[in-house]
Amino acid sequence: MFSPQQPMRNYPQPGPPRPMPNQRMMGRRPPNMRGPSFGAQQQGFQQAGQFLPQANAGARNGAGAGGGLKGMLSRFLPGGGGAGSAGVPGIPGAGAAASGGAGLQGIQNIANPASLSSMLGNVQKVLGMAQQVTPMIQQYGPLVRNLPAMMKLYSQLSKSDDTETEANEESEKQSVSEESSEKEKETETKTSDGNKKSKPKSSSLPKKSKTTDNKEQELKTSAPKKKEAASPAPKRTSGSSKPRLYI
């Protein structure tokens, strides 16, 4: 509102007061002619302050109304909105007049055939885009809706595959363990059979030796008995001879 204060360069020198040029020309005032009092000046300032806020409020209201209409028209029309939307500050009602002018300009722009043709062209473009997009939505809409269910199915299938692989691995491990246990059993049976076969052979040898020893003892005992039975000792008689036959 007020310009910045400038520093005072030419300071007045102290001395007796000098008469003003008007006082030189006109002389002193008559005693009846006095300046306005301080109270009257204060009342004038108060009235001016009351008038200025009212003017500013009217200008703001006018600018707000014009801006709202301008914004609405600029959305629908290219280059819409009046040029004189801003009100004149200090004059009440100027904003309302500017907004009315903006509304009239917007109506004129709507009635303009060029603006109507541009609006129709934009509407046709929007309809064409909608016609192109609707079949794609009809085709891919169910897929998009079923995406969560498809994801669930995929996760379940992956889990089932994992469980199947785990079951196969467990069955393979069990089969390997069973085969190893069977092999161990077979080796144990073979070793036990070999031990059984080796034991009778070793036991048969001493039996044979025992039988041979028994036979030898029997032969030894039977041989002297035969000799005793075969050759009885003859009884000799003194003074007697036996005839011998010579052939």
Swiss-Prot record:
Indicate what this protein is called per its UniProt record. Uncharacterized protein YqfQ
State one Pfam family annotation: YqfQ
Location of the region described as Disordered in the Swiss-Prot/TrEMBL record: 1-43, 157-247
* Coiled coil feature spans: none
Q: Where is the composition biased (Low complexity)?
A: 1-12, 21-43
Q: Where is the composition biased (Basic and acidic residues)?
A: 170-196, 210-229
